[in-house]
Amino acid sequence: MNGDKKQVTDIVETLKKGPLDPNVEVVIGVPAIYLAYVQSIVPGTISVAAQNCWKVAKGAFTGEISPAMIKDIGANWVILGHSERRTIFGEKDDLVAEKVAHALENGLKVIACIGETLEEREAGKTEEVVFRQTKALLPAIGNNWANVVLAYEPVWAIGTGKTASPQQAQDVHASLRNWLSSNASPDVAASVRIQYGGSVTAANAKELSAFPDID
C-alpha cells in the first residue's frame, strides 16, 4: 500500500526510457485503484499486475476484486499469496490455491508467492515450508505452468533491509526445482520461472540473477 499516481507515473516513464531487454518479461504490480490508469499508459512491452484478487467471479465481497474485473481493464497478471497477505490477513495455503485456480481459469497469469518467516528459517524449516506452500498449488495449477511464475520471498527479508545472500537464495531455488521435478515433472522444474523477492536493490540484483536457478 505504497505510492501514489505521480510515483507510479514516474516508474512507468523510467521503464519507457529503457531500453528493456526483449528477452525479459516486464510486469508492474500496482494497487487496484491505479490498475486502469497504469494499463492506459504502459507501452505494449510492459504488462500490469494486480496485487491480489478474490476466488470467485462476483458476489457480496465488498472491497475485493475479481480476475474478471482485472481482465476487463486490460491487465493480464495478478500477484497471489504475498507474504503480507498470508501474515497480516491470515491467508492460508488452501485459500491461496483457490485464488490461483480461479485466476488461471479466467485467463490471468499468476505470480504465486512462497517463503518462510525468520523463525522458520532459524528452525531449519525453510524447505519444509516452501515445499508445503508449493504442494498446495499443484492441483490449482494443473497443466497451466506456462502461465505461472513462482516468487520465493523470505518473509524476514521483505522491506527489512535484510537480504538472503545470493547463495542462500540459489540454494532454496535449486531445492525447489528438485522438488518440482519429483512432484510435478522434470519439464516443469526446468521451465518454470522462479524469481527472488526480498529487499532486492540495483546493487544486488545483478549478483542474484547470475545464479542459474534464479530468474
From Swiss-Prot:
One of its GO terms (biological process) is glycolytic process. The active site is at residues 82, 153. Transmembrane segments: none annotated. It comes from the Eukaryota. The keyword Protein biosynthesis does not apply. Keywords: Gluconeogenesis, Glycolysis, Isomerase. Its EC number is 5.3.1.1. It catalyses: D-glyceraldehyde 3-phosphate = dihydroxyacetone phosphate. It is an enzyme of class 5 (isomerase). The keyword Metal-binding does not apply. It holds the Pfam family TIM. Pathway: Carbohydrate biosynthesis; gluconeogenesis; Carbohydrate degradation; glycolysis; D-glyceraldehyde 3-phosphate from glycerone phosphate: step 1/1. PROSITE patterns: TIM_1, TIM_2. One of its GO terms (cellular component) is cytosol. GO terms for molecular function: triose-phosphate isomerase activity. Homodimer. NCBIfam families: tim. Belongs to the triosephosphate isomerase family. HAMAP family: TIM_B (MF_00147_B). This is Triosephosphate isomerase. The gene is Tpi.
